[in-house]
């Protein structure tokens, strides 16, 4: 009993509790926190094991979208975009990174406020600003500011001393570092991220031990961190009213894009931009090259006054993921593919005030040997791919342009990185001469011997010659023109081009002769393919010829009939000139595509003059010659229907005094038109008549309502509905005091019981009122003692009594 310490009532039920209770409560809270953390860690492990089988097929972007379904105001920032960053701050473990974390932000602040504040400062501008929000849309009080480079982030932190003042509140800035991913390992064969518990690669079955052994020490984190690698990049912070043309104009110095390469995301309701756009290129290599160019710009890229953030568009495909080591080699191979596009854009990008200088890897630099090896592999691959393709010829200029296999120019979006020189640089292209500058060494005395096999030309080793404007090849002594892709031999004064099949330089004269002769087998194949096309082209040319002749004949007849107005004469002249020009064009040109483009316009003009011919052309197909024969036969027969000697119309059986009257009859008479229509229909077959009637039915509008009115007549309009009017019935209400107050009321009986008699006043000495109190109507807005506030009206008075009393009161006031 002595050892037991009893707790008093005061200690047990005090206001703040006893000290023992507080100690026990603190210990219980610490145990619960440890238990929660252990449970969270174990649940994470169980969740990782549970989704082991299909997590490999999902990208981190989808996982973040599942975890964070809310979006910010722009529509493309989610709360989970920085889910892999460490939010906890430890000054001792802080490392520099290009992402800065802002803590302690006001709840009412938005991303636009942070972005405007950042842009107001001088110095490097951020690439992206993301405010972290809860699922309800309320700010969590911190944001991430991402810069393009690490140097920009460090200089920003040093300039602001790791502190900012936003809306009068001091904000602390810290570097945000990604959490280390020790649980994942990267397969070196298929570049797939696998969980730490998986001993073999999920895709290719490679051993985990082999992948860990190949990773050099000290690069574990860099090898395990995987970036996205695809052919599409995303442009962020797009203005709400930016159009696709503005994006193409901003990216034109760095890439050759088409409208279908850019996808601008808009809101379905407001039709305004949601703040981001996608740019898809021909390959992932081109996308990585463009991304490097845009991220290295100083100042950063701006579109419509907005600083644009650039990054890879995160795809759901795991095949596009490459480690850092493999990406370096891919960039080296991509540089060779982009070289051809850089040459082709020289003239279009160079202006009058400056020239374009392209920088290539020169001998002696780091990685030049590896760069050359990848270039040769890339060129050999495309030589094999392009070996069976034929070179296209230009039909308009007449010159033959051959595409070299060494410099493959793709029709997909092309990349070119250029550096403009000062305005004082020479821009005119001079004729190449034997004397070279210091940058181009002297040509070899032997020169290029036709027929000798040479190595594939490497455009990266060429040196720019300022005196001639060409690029000099030190291995062969030739000058290279990037615009025409021809080589110039200064010794023989001859132009050459590279033939990938023969692996030699061929003179341009031989190329034209070879192009004209061609191979018999190829020629026969082309003739077989072009037979139906040439037949269709001949038919179109014949149609044009007939149309031109008919239009000119109508013009002559119209001139002979009478003198028209000047405007009509000019219009006829333009139509005839258009017909002649169209016919001449179709006689000269052999391309079917151009004929199909010009034919509808010319036929449309001719249809106004000859509606029946338009129906005939629509009824027949252009592949048969029966149509041509039929039209020619009808025209010849129609010409015989007029006797120009007797000045008579044989169809209508009428004779006219002169030629002008006969022409006017043919052009303006309704009778002649009806007879001509009947005559033409009689010459057509049943199938042709059905086709003509079908077209007339389609062209003519049938007014069914008018036909119905003619058949049944117009019905009489219905009588308008009258609204039913109900007379409000009189309501009999109770009027007990209309004839005065009698003795039977309760008040009278009570007063009589207290000693009051009728006719005497109230009070002890009967000095009070003798008449009962009546309700009087008072003027609205007037006080109780105001003059004229009451006219002696009561609630039982009629309108006539009220007017009479009011008039009497005004009369007494005047007195």
UniProtKB/Swiss-Prot annotation:
Pfam families: G-patch, OCRE, RRM_1, Zn_ribbon_RanBP. Residues 452-535 are annotated as: Sufficient for interaction with ACIN1, PRPF8, SFRS3, SNRPB, SNRPN, SNRNP70 and SNRNP200. A zinc finger (C2H2-type) spans 647-672. One of its GO terms (molecular function) is mRNA binding. It comes from the Eukaryota. It is found in: Nucleus. Its main location: nucleus. The keyword Cytoplasm does not apply. Residues 393-410, 426-446 have a biased composition (Low complexity). Keywords: Apoptosis, Metal-binding, mRNA processing, mRNA splicing, Nucleus, Phosphoprotein, Repeat, RNA-binding, Spliceosome, Zinc, Zinc-finger. The modification Phosphoserine is found at residues 18, 59, 69, 72, 78, 444, 621, 624. Residues 1-93, 385-468, 508-539 are annotated as: Disordered. Residues 743-789 form the G-patch domain. SMART domains: G_patch, RRM, ZnF_RBZ. One of its GO terms (biological process) is apoptotic process. A zinc finger (RanBP2-type) spans 181-210. GO terms for cellular component: cytosol; nucleoplasm; nucleus; spliceosomal complex. The keyword Membrane does not apply. Residues 98-178, 231-315 form the RRM domain. Residues 321-809 are annotated as: Required for interaction with U2AF2. Residues 411-422 have a biased composition (Polar residues). Component of the spliceosome A complex. Binds to ssRNA containing the consensus sequence 5'-AGGUAA-3'. Regulates alternative splicing of a number of mRNAs. May modulate splice site pairing after recruitment of the U1 and U2 snRNPs to the 5' and 3' splice sites of the intron. May both positively and negatively regulate apoptosis by regulating the alternative splicing of several genes involved in this process, including FAS and CASP2/caspase-2. In the case of FAS, promotes production of a soluble form of FAS that inhibits apoptosis. Belongs to the RBM5/RBM10 family. Component of the spliceosome A complex (also known as the prespliceosome). Appears to dissociate from the spliceosome upon formation of the spliceosome B complex (also known as the precatalytic spliceosome), in which the heterotrimeric U4/U6.U5 snRNPs are bound. Interacts with U2AF2; this interaction is direct. Also interacts with ACIN1, PRPF8, SFRS3, SNRPB, SNRPN, SNRNP70 and SNRNP200; these interactions may be indirect. This is RNA-binding protein 5. It comes from Mus musculus.
């Amino acid at each position: 009993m002595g050892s037991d310490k009893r707790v008093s009532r005061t200690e047990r039920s005090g206001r703040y509790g006893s000290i023992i209770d507080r100690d026990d409560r603190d210990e219980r809270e610490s145990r619960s926190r440890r238990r929660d953390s252990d449970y969270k860690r174990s649940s994470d492990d169980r969740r990782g094991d549970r989704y082991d089988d299909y997590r490999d097929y999902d990208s981190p972007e989808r996982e973040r979208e599942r975890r964070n379904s809310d979006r910010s105001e722009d529509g493309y920032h989610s709360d989970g975009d920085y889910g892999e960053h460490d939010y906890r701050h430890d000054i001792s473990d802080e490392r520099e990174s290009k992402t800065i974390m802002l803590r302690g932000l006001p709840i009412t602040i938005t991303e636009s406020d942070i972005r405007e504040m950042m842009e107001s400062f001088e110095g490097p501008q951020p690439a992206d600003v993301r405010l972290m929000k809860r699922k309800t849309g309320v700010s969590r009080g911190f944001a991430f500011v991402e810069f393009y480079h690490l140097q920009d982030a460090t200089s920003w932190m040093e300039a602001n001393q790791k502190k900012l003042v936003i809306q009068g509140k001091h904000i602390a800035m810290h570097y945000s570092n990604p959490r280390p991913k020790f649980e994942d390992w990267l397969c070196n064969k298929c570049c797939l991220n696998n969980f730490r518990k998986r001993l073999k690669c999920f895709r290719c079955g490679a051993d985990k031990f082999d992948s860990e052994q190949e990773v050099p020490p000290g690069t574990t984190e860099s090898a395990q961190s995987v970036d996205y690698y695809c052919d599409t990049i995303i442009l962020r912070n797009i203005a709400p009213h930016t159009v696709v043309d503005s994006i193409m104009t901003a990216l034109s110095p760095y890439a050759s894009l088409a409208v279908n390469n850019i996808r601008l995301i808009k809101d379905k309701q407001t039709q305004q931009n949601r703040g981001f756009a996608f740019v898809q290129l021909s390959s992932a290599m081109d996308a990585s090259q463009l991304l490097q160019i845009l991220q290295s710009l100083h100042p950063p890229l701006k579109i419509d006054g907005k600083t644009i953030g650039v990054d890879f568009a995160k795809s759901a495909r795991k095949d596009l993921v490459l480690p850092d080591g493999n990406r370096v080699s891919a960039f080296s191979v991509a540089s060779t593919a982009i070289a051809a596009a850089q040459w082709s854009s020289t003239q279009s990008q160079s202006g009058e005030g400056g020239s374009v200088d392209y920088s290539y890897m020169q001998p002696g630099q780091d990685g030049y040997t590896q760069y050359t090896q990848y270039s040769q592999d890339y060129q050999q691959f495309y030589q094999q791919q392009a070996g069976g393709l034929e070179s296209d010829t230009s039909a308009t200029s007449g010159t033959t342009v051959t595409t070299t296999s060494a410099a493959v120019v793709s029709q997909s979006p092309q990349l070119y990185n250029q550096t403009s020189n000062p305005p004082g640089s020479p821009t005119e292209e001079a004729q190449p001469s034997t004397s070279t500058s210091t940058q181009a060494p002297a040509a070899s005395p032997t020169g290029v011997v036709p027929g000798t096999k040479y190595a594939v030309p490497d455009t990266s080793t060429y040196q720019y010659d300022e005196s001639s404007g060409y690029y000099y090849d030190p291995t062969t002594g030739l000058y290279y023109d990037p615009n025409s892709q021809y080589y110039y031999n200064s010794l023989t004064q001859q132009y050459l081009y590279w033939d990938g099949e023969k692996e030699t330089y061929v003179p341009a004269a031989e190329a034209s002769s070879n192009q004209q002769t061609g191979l018999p087998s190829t020629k026969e194949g082309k003739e077989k393919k072009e037979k139906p096309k040439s037949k269709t082209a001949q038919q179109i040319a014949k149609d044009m010829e007939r149309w031109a002749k008919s239009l000119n004949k109508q013009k002559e007849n119209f001139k002979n009939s009478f003198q028209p107005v000047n405007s009509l004469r000019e219009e006829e002249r333009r139509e005839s000139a258009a017909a002649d020009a169209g016919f001449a064009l179709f006689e000269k040109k052999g391309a079917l595509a151009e004929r199909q483009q010009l034919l509808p316009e010319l036929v449309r003009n001719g249809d106004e003059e000859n509606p029946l011919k338009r129906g005939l052309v629509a009824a027949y197909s252009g592949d048969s010659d029966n149509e041509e024969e039929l039209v020619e036969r009808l025209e010849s027969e129609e010409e015989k229907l007029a006797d120009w000697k007797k000045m008579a119309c044989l169809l209508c059986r009428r004779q006219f005094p002169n030629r002008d009257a006969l022409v006017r009859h043919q052009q303006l008479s309704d009778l002649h038109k009806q007879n001509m229509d009947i005559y033409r229909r009689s010459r057509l077959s049943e199938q042709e008549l059905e086709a003509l009637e079908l077209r007339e039915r389609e062209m003519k509008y049938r007014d069914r309502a008018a036909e119905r009115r003619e058949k049944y007549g117009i019905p009489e309009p219905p009588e308008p509905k009258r609204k039913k009017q109900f007379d409000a019935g009189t309501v009999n209400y109770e009027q007990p005091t209309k004839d005065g107050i009698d003795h039977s009321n309760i008040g009278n009986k009570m007063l009589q019981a207290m000693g009051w008699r009728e006719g005497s006043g109230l009070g002890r000495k009967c000095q009070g009122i003798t008449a009962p109190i009546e309700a009087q109507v008072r003027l609205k807005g007037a006080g109780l003692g105001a003059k004229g506030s009451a006219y002696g009206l009561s609630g039982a008075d009629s309108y006539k009594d009220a007017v009479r009393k009011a008039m009497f009161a005004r009369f007494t006031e005047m007195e």
